[in-house]
C-alpha cells in the first residue's frame, strides 16, 4: 500500500508531490474522495495520534467556531472524517511509514524515504 492524500487546489501539496516519483502510488484528491475511516485508522496506527493528523490551519475551525484546545482524540478523528480540510496534507502513507504535512523535518524525512527506496530497487 502506497497512498498520497492531497488537495488539487493546494500549491504546496502539488510542489511537494512533484519532487518524487509517484508512479506506483495511489493518488487521492481529498475534496473528491475524503479519507475513509479505515484509512484514518491505518494512519493512526503509525502516528498514535489523531491530533498529529489534524490541520489546525483548516478554515473550518473558524467557520465552525471550534476551540481546538478543548478537543479530545475522538473529536479530532470525527472532524477529519467529517470534512476533508481537517486532514493535514499532503499525507504519504505506506504500510509502515507516514509523512504528514509540509513541515521542514517531515519533508527531509520524506526525501530520505524516497532516496532509500531507490537504493534498494
List the predicted regions and their residue ranges.
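Local sequence-structure signature of Cys/Sec-based thiol-disulfide redox active-site neighborhoods
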Residues: 1-30
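Thiol/selenol-based redox catalytic cores and closely related redox-interacting motifs
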Residues: 33-121
Amino acid at each position: 500500500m502506497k497512498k498520497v492524500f492531497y488537495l488539487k487546489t493546494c500549491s504546496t501539496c502539488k510542489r511537494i508531490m512533484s519532487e518524487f516519483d509517484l508512479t506506483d502510488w495511489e493518488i487521492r484528491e481529498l475534496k473528491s474522495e475524503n479519507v475513509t475511516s479505515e484509512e484514518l485508522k491505518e494512519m493512526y496506527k503509525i502516528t498514535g495520534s489523531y491530533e498529529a493528523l489534524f490541520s489546525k490551519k483548516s478554515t473550518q475551525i473558524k467557520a465552525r467556531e471550534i476551540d481546538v484546545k478543548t478537543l479530545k482524540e475522538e473529536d479530532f478523528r470525527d472532524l477529519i472524517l467529517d470534512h476533508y480540510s481537517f486532514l493535514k496534507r499532503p499525507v504519504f502513507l505506506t504500510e509502515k511509514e507516514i509523512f504528514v504535512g509540509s513541515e521542514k523535518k517531515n519533508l527531509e524525512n520524506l526525501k530520505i524515504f524516497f532516496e532509500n527506496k531507490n537504493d534498494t530497487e
